[in-house]
């Protein structure tokens, strides 16, 4: 149960270019409308000429200040919240582009995937920087293969050590049994 929750927490949302543009367009339109409402409420508070029936109705009811200002600020907060995921994605993209330099889209995506693989394997930052600065993807593949071989060798060595320990324990147990029989 806990693992499933962590999987959803750690999931990163990635947007295509068209989705980002659509989100910016809709959020900017929504922000513009809501800011317009806030400005309209401020304008009504400052006082419009009384020749408009709507303005007269609002002024007679004496609820325009809290009503329009509340709507304006709530809508402003909502519009800011709609921008947050887009700004987060944009910030990550800009940070990664600054980190990797001037690469084509395919190189950028390939390097991003490879660096993510490296991070998942807990490789030191110095190795990542050295490989990225060389801009040689074959070197990166070779490093990954070497690390996989090292992991396999370490597992084999650990298993061999466990077997040796078990053999030594068995030999000790046999010696103690033989001595106890005498």
From Swiss-Prot:
The chain crosses the membrane at residues 29-49, 63-83. Keywords: Cell membrane, Membrane, Transmembrane, Transmembrane helix. The keyword Cell membrane applies. It is found in: Cell membrane. It comes from the Bacteria. It is a multi-pass membrane protein. GO terms for cellular component: plasma membrane. This is Uncharacterized protein UU159. It comes from Ureaplasma parvum serovar 3 (strain ATCC 700970). The lineage of its organism: Bacteria, Bacillati, Mycoplasmatota, Mycoplasmoidales, Mycoplasmoidaceae.
């Amino acid at each position: 149960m806990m693992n499933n929750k962590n999987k959803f927490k750690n999931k990163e949302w990635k947007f295509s270019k068209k989705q980002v543009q659509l989100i910016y367009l809709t959020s900017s339109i929504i922000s513009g409308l809501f800011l317009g409402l806030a400005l309209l409420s401020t304008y009504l508070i400052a006082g419009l000429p009384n020749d408009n029936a709507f303005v007269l109705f609002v002024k007679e009811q004496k609820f325009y200040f809290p009503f329009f200002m509340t709507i304006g600020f709530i809508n402003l907060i909502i519009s800011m919240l709609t921008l947050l995921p887009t700004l987060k994605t944009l910030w990550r993209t800009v940070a990664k582009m600054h980190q990797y330099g001037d690469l084509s889209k395919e190189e950028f995506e390939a390097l991003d995937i490879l660096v993510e693989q490296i991070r998942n394997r807990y490789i030191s930052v110095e190795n990542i920087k050295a490989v990225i600065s060389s801009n040689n993807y074959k070197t990166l593949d070779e490093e990954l293969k070497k690390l996989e071989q090292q992991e396999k060798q370490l597992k084999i060595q650990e298993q061999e050590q466990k077997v040796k320990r078990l053999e030594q324990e068995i030999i000790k147990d046999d010696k103690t049994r033989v001595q106890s029989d005498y």
